[in-house]
């Protein structure tokens, strides 16, 4: 699995916490300390705070340097991303298969979502020139019975106040095909052996801007799927694995049955041999009597 890269949206700075209040016993104990001891403690606390500020300053500097390196390598990766997209275009249903095989994304997909995603031909993730300012995810679709758009996009950025924000393409749904307004229904797909209430449509993600700073689906696509989608496309189908397991069990049972038959046959042959031996002994006894 590809390593997760640092999010382009900068983390909020943590304010230093004040030292915990002293309990009654500690207060009374410290009250008995010489003033010199109190002064040394206060000076130590102030020095610790100064050192911590230096550590925080270096951490911020490191983050800036990491972002610069990431920006440099983003440019170097672009030709390879383009070549990969051209090759992926030769594989039918690559992206819908990748999404269905991803455990977090598949949990968001209903039956009709999967049908719509069969028309998805390309996915592109673009990180902005100033990485800290955000990124955009573009979904390219063939002509389909659900909506008019050829491209659906969602963008994550920092607004004027510096807070995470997002915006997206307005989906132009065809008459009666708005998947975000469908009623909840029960799904039973024998091919994937699941029966549960339909999840909220995947496409509601394009209209949900409630918490852009913690958009799990956007982060999963950008940091987990986009760096190496092939690893999820090649995940073996669980139903196939279960089917193979059942076939193996059947084969084992058949082999055990054949072994039992062979053992019974050997026992029968042994009994017949014993009967033949007894018959021969009887004939010999009769001959001796004569």
From Swiss-Prot:
Residues 1-45, 158-207, 236-290 are annotated as: Disordered. There is a cross-link at residue 154 (Glycyl lysine isopeptide (Lys-Gly) (interchain with G-Cter in ubiquitin)). Residues 31-78 are annotated as: Dimerization. It holds the Pfam family NAP. GO terms for biological process: DNA replication; negative regulation of DNA-templated transcription; negative regulation of neuron apoptotic process; nucleosome assembly; nucleosome disassembly. Multitasking protein, involved in apoptosis, transcription, nucleosome assembly and histone chaperoning. Isoform 2 anti-apoptotic activity is mediated by inhibition of the GZMA-activated DNase, NME1. In the course of cytotoxic T-lymphocyte (CTL)-induced apoptosis, GZMA cleaves SET, disrupting its binding to NME1 and releasing NME1 inhibition. Isoform 1 and isoform 2 are potent inhibitors of protein phosphatase 2A. This is Protein SET.
């Amino acid at each position: 699995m590809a390593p997760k890269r640092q999010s382009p949206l900068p983390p909020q700075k943590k304010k230093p916490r004040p030292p915990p209040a002293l309990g009654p016993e500690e207060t009374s104990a410290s009250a008995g300390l010489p003033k010199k001891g109190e002064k040394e403690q206060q000076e130590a606390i102030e020095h610790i705070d100064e050192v911590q500020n230096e550590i925080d300053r270096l951490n911020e500097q490191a983050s800036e340097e990491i972002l610069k390196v990431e920006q440099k390598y983003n440019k170097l990766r672009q030709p390879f991303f383009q070549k990969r997209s051209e090759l992926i275009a030769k594989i039918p249903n690559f992206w819908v298969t990748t999404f269905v095989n991803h455990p977090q994304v598949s949990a968001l997909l209903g039956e009709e979502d999967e049908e719509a995603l069969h028309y998805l031909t390309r996915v592109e993730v673009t990180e902005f020139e100033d990485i800290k300012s955000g990124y955009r995810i573009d979904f390219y679709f063939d002509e389909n019975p659900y909506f008019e758009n050829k491209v659906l996009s969602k963008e994550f950025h920092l607004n004027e106040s510096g807070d995470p924000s997002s915006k997206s393409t307005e989906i132009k749904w065809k008459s009666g095909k708005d998947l975000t307004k469908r009623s909840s229904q029960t799904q039973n797909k024998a091919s994937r052996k699941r029966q549960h209430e339909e999840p909220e449509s995947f496409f509601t993600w394009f209209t949900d801007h409630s918490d852009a700073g913690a958009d799990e689906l956007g982060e999963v696509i950008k940091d987990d799927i986009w760096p190496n989608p092939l690893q999820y496309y090649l995940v073996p189908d669980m139903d196939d694995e279960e089917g193979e397991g059942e076939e193996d069990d059947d084969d084992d049972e058949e082999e055990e049955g054949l072994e039992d038959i062979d053992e019974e046959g050997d026992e029968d042959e042994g009994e017949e041999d014993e009967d033949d031996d007894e018959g021969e002994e009887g004939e010999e006894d009769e001959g001796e009597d004569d």
